[in-house]
Amino acid sequence: MDIIKQIKIYPPANDGISRILVIYEVEDVLPEEDNGHYLSIDLGLHNLMTCYDNVGKTFIIGREYLSLSYFYNKEIARVQSQWGRIQAAREMEDLKTSKHLQKLYRKKNDCIKDYIHKMTRYITNYCVKNEIHTVVIGDIKGIRKERNLGRKTNQKLHGLPYARIYMQLEYKLKMKGICLIRQEESYSSQCPPQSEEVSHIYAEKRNRKKRGIYIVDTVIYNADAVGAYNILRKYHAVSGKKIDMPVTGLSSTKTIKVAV
């Protein structure tokens, strides 16, 4: 049982909200031994997290994130425009942010934090239920600087909360004794699952016929599922561990909906 060590109560700040900080002690959890059961995760734009379970299952979680973010961004832009016209009409020299706008920013941030918490909790519970002791996640460090994917796509990438996902997932898994490993993921979305290795030598951009689809000969795969699969292949190559990796499930990916 967790032992509460300290409770701090902060009075309302400028936003009018009181905050309570609870500090509690938890027992150290020893890392589970590698049992050959893995989950790999490909972080994306439209599908925030695509997961491959090496028993031959795949699922997508986080598809609602972009629409959630778009809704608040659109509403914030609308209120900003209205407030700008009001300040101009009143000839206000000391420009301030409206309380309505502050409330919208706060609500957006809280909503996204809650959504990421629910996603990472689902993945943690999935690993515990299925006795997965190692999670391998694609390391997208530098991707937003190195790639020019167009103005709109780059704009969306810069707004994605990848650092928060890493942090939330890492601490939740650690509390269950599950290891989280970041794996460099270059060419993971371009190489066929049957290629000898995941590298520029076997990269086939033309196999991605359109967004979400990856075709090898006559077989149609989910492109993000292929990415998650290849991330685990890259980990297999650098770790030297023997990992069973059936391609079943790459064509039929289940979508997990998270309450917003």
What are these regions (language model features)?
Residues 1-14, 159:
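Acidic carboxylate diad motif detector
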Residues 14-260:
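Positively charged, helix-rich recognition surfaces that bind polyanionic ligands
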